[in-house]
Structure formats: structure tokens, C-alpha cells
Design a protein with these regions (language model features):
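Glycine-rich phosphate-binding loops of nucleotide-dependent enzymes
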Residues: 2-5, 13-287
């Protein structure tokens, strides 16, 4: 369905089993007088994959940074399970049950793959720096548990064989999986993915799509992506941005047939699946 303004936000209140796990309400962001987002609203629901798409310059990256709490909007609010968020530091995301991956990956080149993933799992540790420094038995036990958790995630993503390797020695698609493993090791209830398919082959994107769908039994996913075939296949709902505004929101089938979306991507070319850049066919519900 088309939207010339942001979707109406649900009434404030305690999050329910079916209420949003993350909401952006009437968010506006400007940089030096340039409006990056204007009155944007969206909601990520439990066990849902929400896709965010739009042409280049539509405001997707800004929206992602707002959702992460790294950009504070000029107006509007970000609500995480009924808790209004302000500006966050990276280490605070895990405490809110959130994890993210970035286009730049952000891996530690001088740490092994396993140790990179342990960094993500570290939010579960209860022994502080002093306890670790003194090598208390409890600290040693927690270290073993964190490494076991990290190895389990590497196994889940099919990259356990790389545990002792270092990121610079790995192919780019494997490094992408390491970054995802680090995020999953935090055991989030909301996973934020920024362009996870960039640099992947068609077969690797298919594997990524299957993985993202498999995650929804234990978390929600917000996916910012420009590969339309992946978005249409894995997302339950899609929010479309253009020039910093929400122009459409709905199921993949609804978005694919929306005239405003077709115009934003293709100009006046509508309804021709063979046209360059045409939106791919999809099944209902992103399944």
C-alpha cells in the first residue's frame, strides 16, 4: 500500500507478545540543512524480517544509524520494547538485546576468528576486568563458556574450520559470515543488518536468505539492503524510502506492485519484468 506520510505509530505502552520490538515514530534528521529523513515511522515486530529499501540517497543508512541509536533525530522518537532510546554507544546495544552488522565489517585483524566472535558473546560475562586480571576460577569458567558459545555460532554458520585463522587471510564472503557470527554470539532478540549481501555471489545470497529466515524463530531482523531479489524473498514486510520519506509499506507483493515504488526505481517504466532493474517476482510473506 502506498504511503505519502509515515505509518501511524501504535499507542505508547508496554510491549506485548505481538507489539513491536522496535519503533521509529515520526523521525526527522537533518545534516547541515539537508533533510536526510522526514517524518519517518516504522515498526519491527516479533519474529519478523522487516526490509528497508530505496534508491541511492533515499536515507537508508541514516535510518539504520537512527535505529541503532548512533544518530539522534532532530524530532521523533525511537522505542525499543516500550523503552525510549537516546543516543547509544556500541557497547550499549547488546544490553538492549540488539546486535548489528555493518558494511565495513569492523573485524579485528589481529584477533583470530574465534576471538572476534567471543567479543560478541562477551555481553554474557559477569566477571569484570579485575576478576579476569586475577584469573579467578569463575573468570576461567566464563571464558570457557564464551568460547564454547562462539564455536557453536561458527558451526551454525558453517565457518568453524576458520576459527584459528585471522580475518585478513579470509575471502570476503567468509569475513562477512564472521561479522554475522559475532553479532549472533550476543544472542540478540533484534538483529540489524546493513547491506549483508554486498559482495556475495548469487548462490551465497541464497544461502544468506535461508539463514536470515531461519533466525526468526528466536529473533526479529531489520534488513537494509539493495539486492531486491533477496529482500523480496526473505522479508515479511518492506518499508520503502525515497528522498528521506516513506513512500510505501507492505508485504513484498504489495510493494512490488506499488506505482510509487516502481516510479522511484524505474521512472515511468512499470509492469515490465524484463525492464532493467525491474522488481523481481515474489511469494507472499517473504517465505
Amino acid at each position: 500500500m502506498s504511503a505519502t506520510s509515515s505509518p501511524a505509530a501504535p499507542s505508547p505502552g508496554a510491549a506485548s507478545a505481538t507489539g513491536p520490538v522496535l519503533e521509529l515514530r515520526d523521525v526527522t534528521v537533518t545534516f547541515g540543512g539537508v533533510t536526510a529523513l522526514s517524518g519517518v515511522g516504522l515498526a519491527v515486530r516479533p519474529h519478523q524480517v522487516l526490509g528497508v529499501i530505496g534508491p541511492n540517497g533515499a536515507g537508508k543508512t541514516t535510518l539504520f544509524n537512527v535505529a541503532c541509536g548512533f544518530v539522534t533525530p532532530d524530532t521523533g522518537t525511537i522505542v525499543r520494547e516500550a523503552r525510549e532510546l537516546g543516543r547509544l554507544h556500541a557497547h550499549q546495544l547488546a544490553g538492549l538485546g540488539m546486535a548489528r552488522t555493518l558494511q565495513g565489517l569492523g573485524l579485528f585483524d589481529r584477533m583470530s576468528v574465534l576471538d572476534n566472535v567471543v567479543v560478541g558473546a562477551d555481553r554474557h560475562a559477569s566477571v569484570g576486568f579485575l576478576g579476569s586480571l586475577l584469573a579467578l576460577p569463575r573468570a576461567a569458567r566464563e571464558e570457557r563458556e564464551l568460547r564454547e558459545r562462539a564455536r557453536a555460532v561458527l558451526e551454525e554458520l558453517g565457518i568453524a574450520a576458520y576459527a584459528d585463522r585471522y580475518p585478513p587471510s579470509l575471502p570476503y564472503p567468509v569475513r562477512k559470515r564472521v561479522a554475522l557470527a559475532r553479532a549472533l554470539a550476543a544472542e540478540p532478540t533484534l538483529l540489524l543488518l546493513d547491506e549483508p549481501a554486498s559482495g556475495l555471489s548469487a548462490d551465497e545470497m541464497d544461502e544468506l536468505g535461508d539463514l536470515v529466515r531461519s533466525l526468526t524463530d528466536r529473533m526479529s531482523v531489520m534488513l537494509v539492503e539493495h539486492h531486491m531479489d533477496l529482500v523480496m524473498r526473505v522479508c515479511d514486510e518492506i518499508t520503502v524510502l525515497d528522498f528521506g520519506r516513506v513512500i510505501a509499506h507492505g508485504t513484498p507483493a504489495e510493494v512490488r506492485d506499488d506505482p510509487a515504488v516502481l516510479a522511484a526505481y524505474l521512472g515511468e517504466v512499470v509492469g515490465d519484468e524484463d525492464a532493467p532493474g525491474a522488481l523481481p517476482a515474489t511469494t507472499e510473506g517473504g517465505r
